[in-house]
């Protein structure tokens, strides 16, 4: 039986991080976690990391699509936070963001790591951005690196 698994050390990986400005006080922590994981655990060089800011989570799929189409990156990490409010806006933004990012990954055959928090409250978002529940930005970055290696192994 053949088993394909990836490792997270990828010193030559070229990684883009697309991040939403909306809810920046939470997203900044996601970004810090992602960059730290890429550099410290993944051993990715600073010059191989590109950060692209967009207005909100809804705009992430378009930016990630452009990054994928550029062929300049081995993976893209999408970071943002969508917090439920009193209207249906949450469902629309979270759903379109998630399905849009998934569609880009499948179309471009490029790892697109989902680091977009979809929470019921600000407190839950803060917990997932580096306090009680770890840092989902770091987790997404490591997922991207592992998927780079998995796809390389599949193609080998």
UniProtKB/Swiss-Prot annotation:
Active site: 89
Amino-acid positions noted as binding (2S)-2-hydroxy-3-oxobutyl phosphate in the UniProt annotation, renumbered to this chain: 86-87, 128
Broad class of enzyme this protein falls into: transferase
Molecular function in Gene Ontology: 6,7-dimethyl-8-ribityllumazine synthase activity
Pathway where it operates: Cofactor biosynthesis; riboflavin biosynthesis; riboflavin from 2-hydroxy-3-oxobutyl phosphate and 5-amino-6-(D-ribitylamino)uracil: step 1/2
EC number: 2.5.1.78
Domain of life: Bacteria
Record: residues binding 5-amino-6-(D-ribitylamino)uracil: 22, 57-59, 81-83, 114
Keywords recorded for this protein, A-Z: Riboflavin biosynthesis, Transferase
GO cellular component labels: cytosol; riboflavin synthase complex
InterPro entries: LS, LS/RS, LS/RS_sf
Catalytic activity, as annotated: (2S)-2-hydroxy-3-oxobutyl phosphate + 5-amino-6-(D-ribitylamino)uracil = 6,7-dimethyl-8-(1-D-ribityl)lumazine + phosphate + 2 H2O + H(+)
GO biological process entries: riboflavin biosynthetic process
Function, in words: Catalyzes the formation of 6,7-dimethyl-8-ribityllumazine by condensation of 5-amino-6-(D-ribitylamino)uracil with 3,4-dihydroxy-2-butanone 4-phosphate. This is the penultimate step in the biosynthesis of riboflavin.
Protein family: Belongs to the DMRL synthase family.
Assembly and binders: Forms an icosahedral capsid composed of 60 subunits, arranged as a dodecamer of pentamers.
Name of the protein described by the UniProt record: 6,7-dimethyl-8-ribityllumazine synthase
Species for this entry: Sodalis glossinidius (strain morsitans)
């Amino acid at each position: 039986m053949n088993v394909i698994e990836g490792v997270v050390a990828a010193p030559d990986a070229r990684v883009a991080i697309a991040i939403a400005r909306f809810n920046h006080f939470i997203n900044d922590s996601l970004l810090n976690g992602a960059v730290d994981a890429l550099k410290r655990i993944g051993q990715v060089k600073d010059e191989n990391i590109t950060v692209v800011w967009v207005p909100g989570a809804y705009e992430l799929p378009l930016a990630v699509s452009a990054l994928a189409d550029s062929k300049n990156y081995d993976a893209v990490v999408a970071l943002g936070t969508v917090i439920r409010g009193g209207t249906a806006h949450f469902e629309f933004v979270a759903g379109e963001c998630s399905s849009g990012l998934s569609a880009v990954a499948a179309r471009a055959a490029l790892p697109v790591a989902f680091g977009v928090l979809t929470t019921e409250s600000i407190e839950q978002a803060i917990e997932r951005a580096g306090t009680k529940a770890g840092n989902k930005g770091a987790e997404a970055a490591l997922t991207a690196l592992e998927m780079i290696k998995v796809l390389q192994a599949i193609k080998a």
